[in-house]
Amino acid sequence: MAVTMRQMLEAGVHFGHQTRFWNPKMAPFIFGHRNKIHIINLEKTLPMYNDALKYARQLAANRGTILFVGTKRQSRDTIAEEAQRAGMPYVNARWLGGMLTNFKTLKVSIKRLKDMEAALEAGETERMSKKEALLFEREMAKLQKSIGGVKDMGGIPDAIFVVDVGYHKIAVTEANKLGIPVIAVVDTNHSPEGIDYVIPGNDDASKAVALYTAGVADAIVEGRANAVNEVVQAARGGDGDEFVEVNAEA
């Protein structure tokens, strides 16, 4: 379902940061200011948001992977819930330096986490001493918190979706270094440089964050569904006509 400008207004997407903290590179997306707060031009935001969703939809239709990134308190739960709904990996605790640029090291940690989960499932912790079991549980909980959202990623993602580019500048820098497209919410206090699909908007309000994230997840789900429908149509011959058995005696 398409998001309207009214929904963006109700979610507070148009509220930027204090004027004294602005980044001049966001000037093209600013409508004006009120009470020393910059007001973002939603007539610019809405089509750019839709462009970002179109890209996410196409990427998902081609079986691409989009990594969701949002580690701020007000976005953690939303990022995890929507990424899981879309069947995509996510980072909602802390971005570990090298998650993209040093993926080999991350794979070692992922293997460790999976081995520990398998050991727990097999009941191996029951044979440990209380102290060993406690240390095991602590290590596994720590790994689940930091990399649990990416344990099934399998490799470098095809794109990343970021809420707040300033807070996650290391993630953006790593993606830029590897040529991974970046979809991101950019507020008035940050630069849109290095972002392939800019969504000018409030990156702090929970309702705004929920709106962007749900939209990206919806686009992914829709893209995958469209891809499945195309495969089904192709299997049927492409024209959707029903197969009619011809009686040889007719």
From Swiss-Prot:
**Biological process GO annotation list?**
translation
* PROSITE patterns for this protein: RIBOSOMAL_S2_1
What are the alphabetically sorted keywords of the record?
A: Ribonucleoprotein, Ribosomal protein
Gene3D superfamilies recorded: Glucose-6-phosphate isomerase like protein, domain 1 (3.40.50.10490), Helix hairpin bin (1.10.287.610)
Pfam families associated with the record: Ribosomal_S2
Query: What GO annotations for molecular function exist for this entry?
Result: structural constituent of ribosome
Q: Does the keyword Nucleus apply?
A: no
Q: Name one GO cellular component term.
A: cytosolic small ribosomal subunit
Q: Which CDD domains match?
A: RPS2
The family database entries (InterPro entries) matched by this protein are listed as: Ribosomal_uS2, Ribosomal_uS2_bac/mit/plastid, Ribosomal_uS2_CS, Ribosomal_uS2_flav_dom_sf
Would you say which domain of life the source belongs to? Bacteria
Q: Which family does it belong to?
A: Belongs to the universal ribosomal protein uS2 family.
- Official protein name in the record: Small ribosomal subunit protein uS2
UniProt organism field: Paraburkholderia xenovorans (strain LB400)
What gene name does this entry carry? rpsB
